[in-house]
Amino acid sequence: MLIQGDASALEWRCASFLSQDEVASKEIWNDVDQHSDNQNRFGLPSRLIAKTFVFRLIYGGSAYSYANDPNFAEVSKSEKFWDKVIEEFYLKYKGLHRWHIKLMQEATSTRKVCLPTGRIYEFEPTIRNGQKVFPRTTILNYPVQGLGADLMTIARVSLFNRMKGKFTDAKLVNTVHDSIIIDCDDKHTDELSQMMLDVFEDVPKNFQKLFGVEFNLPMKAEVQIGNNWKGMEVWS
């Protein structure tokens, strides 16, 4: 039996934690479907479009990139339209906006960005038309992806330690971005599925133990089970 644990909204939680955005944090704590709210708030045609828009923006998306993306062509090819949506996004998530500005200032002045986990990213500018240009999308992307990788490592090591010696016929077989996969005997499905949920929920506690910093957001996961990766169903 395969058991797959998917971290819920991993990148959004990482961006919300790093920016300490109050609105995003409240939405996470209150289980608000922020993508549906943003769809209505920003006048976008679907939840999926709203979700894609948000994740591109936290990685440095621009009005030009949205207006010239075929996937957004049916929404609008107008940069003015997307400028307005971006403005409304940052008005809602003011903390995220301030963090984006701070990241760029930090990266351009020190040429590096440091994370609470000890990761250090260094950035070198390129020269365009005699001007130094720093890679904005990379600067905004790396901290979120890096913290996500660290949180997944905490969950993975915790799961391995809990399984060790107790489930001799169960193995950690794969990790795919925000997912952890176990292969086990059917008789252990329920116990290991619950364990999978527990290790994700315990990530904030273990984060503070490891790094001495409070991770002040909850972590959650969805667990799926199946005899093969194609036929997974939600475990409950």
Tell what function each PLM region has.
Residues M1-S236:
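Conserved catalytic core of nucleotide polymerization and phosphodiester-bond processing enzymes
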